């Protein structure tokens, strides 16, 4: 597995653990209320599981399994994929922190722009590798 895929999967697992933990805390607080402000974790819970876990795992596996080029470097210039990794994680954390601490909407907007930038950067990187392999 390439190093970038390892990092995507590791970060996805970290986001899964955080999202699961936040969800468990909110669920237990719903059954036995002990700290009302735990509901502020809901945006982070959603962000960590939908984009931090699901999307990041998909991108890491896609980088790994998509067809490689016949010549070196086999996966092409990886810079775009690394940029996607950094932008996605910055975006996920910006949106999560903005929701938890009730920061201005501009912080959430910046986080979403970073996430879109990650999608564009990854798409640009992976596009040349979307080819049929016959024979």
Locations of regions flagged by a protein language model:
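Hydrophobic alpha-helical transmembrane segments of multi-pass integral membrane proteins
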Residues: 1-135
């Amino acid at each position: 597995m390439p190093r970038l895929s390892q990092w995507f999967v590791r970060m996805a697992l970290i986001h899964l653990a955080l999202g699961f933990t936040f969800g468990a805390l909110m669920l237990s607080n719903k059954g036995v209320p002990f700290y009302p402000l735990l509901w502020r974790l809901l945006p982070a819970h959603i962000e960590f599981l939908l984009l931090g876990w699901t999307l990041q795992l998909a991108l890491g596996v896609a980088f790994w399994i998509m067809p490689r080029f016949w010549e070196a470097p086999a996966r092409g210039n990886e810079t775009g994929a690394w940029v996607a990794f950094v932008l996605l994680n910055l975006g996920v954390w910006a949106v999560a922190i903005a929701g938890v601490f009730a920061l201005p909407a501009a912080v959430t907007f910046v986080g979403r722009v970073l996430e879109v930038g990650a999608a564009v950067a990854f798409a640009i990187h992976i596009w040349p590798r979307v080819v049929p392999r016959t024979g």
